[in-house]
Amino acid sequence: MFKTINKSITSILLLLISFYQKWFSPFFGPRCRFIPSCSSYGYEAITRHGPWKGGWLTLKRLSRCHPLTPCGCDPVPD
């Protein structure tokens, strides 16, 4: 049952990220300070690590994405 819940949450989160990438991101233009972009990072983190750890990694990344943080390459950890 826990695996089913994890898969459902993963699917919902990935759907939300895909929706953002397709419908909202083109209007805002490139704003992320990192490579890969925050939405791509979130998609990869959730795909690799599942909804809980991947979601946490994504939230940490989003909290670092602001003008006071140095930009650069920030890949998803293994």
From Swiss-Prot:
GO terms for cellular component: plasma membrane. Pfam families: YidD. It is a peripheral membrane protein. Keywords: Cell inner membrane, Cell membrane, Membrane. It comes from the Bacteria. It is found in: Cell inner membrane. HAMAP family: UPF0161_YidD. Could be involved in insertion of integral membrane proteins into the membrane. Belongs to the UPF0161 family. This is Putative membrane protein insertion efficiency factor. It comes from Prochlorococcus marinus (strain MIT 9301).
